[in-house]
Design a protein with these regions (language model features):
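Conserved small-residue
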Residues: 4-720
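Glycine-rich phosphate-binding loop of nucleotide-binding enzymes
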Residues: 1
């Protein structure tokens, strides 16, 4: 636990806490929370026994024998949770979007503030079920589904004739979906009863279609890839926009800069546009990512509008205090499935950013600016995001590591397939296709294949021919495959990156090990408590960047895994699939989880949740359950107001699997658990299907939203 707090490098002994809030029976109310034992609040009880729950084995078997999950935002005794914003609320000239994720708090004068909010993606079931009620107009979902089914479920919308009966319903649904994602800025005010939503002049929406009908609102792009966008001769598709971009979507997490801007991370863009690129960085045509809708999946939203895939998957900078300022995609930071951004800005040093690529086998990246920071608060620092060096992490099993620059002269030396085979795992090593007239990847199947590949391509320049910014831009557009070719470590879905203000360490959440056919986490680095090579419950890592103050190419770092997900009887700490982080001024680490709603063995952990790792006191380093979310949702985007008396959280996709909960729509699940003495016992769990949050009444549609959590007495969030 001391390692988690950055206080020791000794071997970390995993301990555990909880994940959801149980009740004494399938119909009873919630249990009282843990007795206070010097903890900063009374932690919630979860659905599984924990060493820290204060119960002996007999009591654990009694308490956890029958449990019901709650379709509610549950917080500890003495706290309250208030809905601040929800899907469909007016926001500027538009609406508060769907599936809000990352939140950034910007203080203004006079008790006013701004919340910058990401709207990540569309969950078709609850979105279709609630759209008419929320937006006040109907979309032709049934007609679209019927027409598409007759054509195999997918279509290249760009070739539809004007009088095709499919065209209008398709454009109506695709437009509405892209308008419901992107970024928003909402003004709030501090009243006696806490933070309240108040419309203001800073209210703003960017969507997936911003700039389509009003070209003056198109996003700018900076950095080397902008040179690729401007090329007139290319191997692939030309959208005719040069270095301008239509909209932003797949906005997951992000980061804030000391000069007042917000960085929004485009993550799973591959759902809607073509991800692979040619050797020159250009994209295949949108026809390769056709539009699809069947009521369960909604994909290829970029296809009807001819969006070029190489313009998505970037970090977007927005100034919430200047709505007239154009949003910018900074391509020097690389194109991959960005989850979040951590920013280190110190006077006299280069600007350093850290970001993870959230995919199985994704990498951890570091960006180092070419020039140095003069004043961290100077708005001119945005220019430091335009020229710099993108690097990718290579981890070693001994706890060391180094940064590999993604530059033309970087040697091609991908991992050997035998590295994975030694752990009895199949190698999933995609690298840029050896036929450089083709877009995308090929898999290295054997060590001999790897050696032949290296003989043919000595450096990244051999894979990405050209010169100058255009060559570097192509590498950055294809950052994930270029990183694989350069020998970066494939990791376990790296999600959030946050800097510890006390130690300077980088905190990284890795959501899950294993493979999905696209990539495989390195089993020499990411192992379960008993050495498992495909551990699905995730980790929290601390990374000490040795040259953070003066980062050189090929610099080194030290790393250690300091918290492991999983059940206590498996050696885990009681949570599953860590996702977003927030670190308060006292160094307490707040963490939310991203357990898929239907995830096999992970279902034992119940609803997704928010945890606290205290930095000091009797519970230092111990995960304490602070909140659980409604049914089938994630809690995301934790952030604080300036006094740290309010925690803001996004409640994303409630009812994602079953949409609206109806009276009596529950199922009973059975689990085999283990008490503190190692005795097995059975649990029956009542699980509502679907959600009615935030209305709280059966039959009411679920709506994603933002909550403000504070103490009922108005004191700081944590007791000192």
């Amino acid at each position: 636990m001391l390692q988690l707090l950055g206080l020791s490098t000794a071997v970390f002994a995993t301990r555990t806490q909880a994940a959801v809030r149980p009740s004494r029976s399938a119909t009873a109310g919630p249990l009282a929370a843990f007795p206070t034992t010097g903890r900063p609040f009374e932690p919630l009880l979860g659905p599984i026994p924990l060493p820290s729950d204060g119960l002996d084995a007999s009591a654990q078997r009694s308490v956890y024998g029958r449990v019901n999950l709650r379709d509610d935002m549950v917080v500890p005794r003495g706290y309250r949770s208030d809905v601040l914003l929800q899907w469909g609320d007016p926001l500027g000239s538009a609406r508060f979007g769907f599936n809000n994720d990352y939140l950034a708090f910007t203080s203004l004068e006079g008790g006013r503030a701004l919340l910058t909010v990401n709207f990540e993606y569309i969950s078709p079931r609850p979105w279709c079920a609630g759209y008419k009620e929320v937006m006040g107009r109907e979309l032709p979902f049934a007609r679209l589904k019927e027409l598409l089914a007759s054509r195999g479920g997918s279509v290249n919308a760009l070739v539809l004739e004007m009088d095709d009966p499919l065209r209008q319903p398709l454009l109506a649904v695709a437009s509405a979906a892209l308008e419901d994602v992107g970024i928003g800025v909402a003004e709030i005010t501090l009243e006696q009863q806490g933070w309240q939503r108040r419309s203001g002049r800073f209210d703003r929406r960017l969507s997936g279609l911003t700039g389509l009908s009003r070209p003056q609102e198109q996003l700018r792009s900076t950095g080397p890839a902008a040179a690729v966008f401007r090329r007139r001769q290319r191997l692939g598709y030309d959208d005719g926009l040069s270095d301008r971009v239509i909209g932003t979507f797949a906005n997951c997490a992000g980061g804030q800069t000391p000069w007042g801007t917000v960085l929004s991370a485009e993550e799973n863009f591959q759902t809607h546009v073509v991800e692979p690129v040619y050797a020159d960085g250009s994209s295949p045509p949108p026809a390769q990512r056709p539009f699809h809708f069947d009521g369960e999946r909604l994909e290829g939203l970029g296809n009807p509008f001819g969006l070029s895939g190489n313009k998505y998957g970037w970090v977007v900078e927005i100034d919430p205090r200047r709505p007239e300022r154009t949003a910018v995609k900074h391509t020097a930071l690389g194109r991959f499935r960005h989850e979040a951004v951590a920013v280190r800005a110190r006077a006299g040093e280069p600007l350093v950013l850290y970001s993870g690529c959230d995919r199985h086998g994704g990498h951890l990246y570091r960006y180092v600016s070419e020039a140095v920071v003069r004043d961290p608060g100077d708005q001119a620092n945005s220019r430091l995001l335009e020229r710099g060096r993108l690097e990718v992490a290579r981890f070693q099993p001994d706890g060391s590591g180094r940064w590999i620059p993604l530059q033309p002269q970087t040697p091609v030396e991908p991992l050997l397939p035998s590295h994975f085979e030694a752990f009895e795992l199949p190698a999933v090593l995609p690298v840029p296709h050896s036929d450089r007239s083709q877009a995308g990847a090929e898999l290295l199947r054997s060590d001999a294949h790897q050696r032949d590949y290296r003989q043919r391509f000595r450096t990244l320049a051999d894979l990405y021919p050209g010169s100058g910014e255009e060559q570097l831009g192509a590498i950055l557009i294809d950052a994930h495959l270029a990183a694989n070719a350069a020998g970066a470590t494939p990791t376990a879905r790296p999600e959030d990156t946050e800097l510890d203000p006390r130690t300077g360490d980088l905190l990284i959440t890795f959501t899950a090990g294993g493979s999905d056919g696209e990539g495989q986490a390195d089993p020499a680095i990411f192992r379960g408590p008993a050495g498992e090579t495909s551990w699905p419950y995730g980790w929290l890592m601390r990374l000490q960047d040795d040259g953070a103050g003066n980062p050189e190419p090929g610099g080194t770092f030290r790393w250690r895994l300091v918290a492991t997900g999983g059940t206590p009887w498996q050696g885990g700490m009681g949570f599953a699939n860590p996702d977003n982080l927030a670190v308060d001024r006292a160094g307490n680490v707040w963490m939310v989880t991203d357990r898929a709603s239907v995830n096999g063995s992970a279902d034992v952990f119940g609803n997704n949740s928010c945890w606290l790792f205290p930095a000091a006191g009797p519970a230092a380093g111990e995960p304490l359950l602070f909140a659980t979310g409604p049914m089938e949702c994630e809690l995301t985007g934790p952030c604080f107001d300036q006094s740290e008396s309010t925690l803001f959280l996004s409640v994303q996709h409630p009812g994602e699997d079953n949409a609206t909960h109806q009276q009596g729509q529950e199922e009973i699940q059975a689990y085999s658990l283990m008490d503190r003495d190692g005795g097995r016992f059975e649990q029956l769990r009542l699980v509502p299907l679907g959600s009615n949050w935030p209305a709280g009444r059966a039959g009411q549609i679920p709506r994603p939203g933002v909550v403000a959590i504070r103490r009922q007495d108005g004191a700081p969030l944590l007791m000192r």
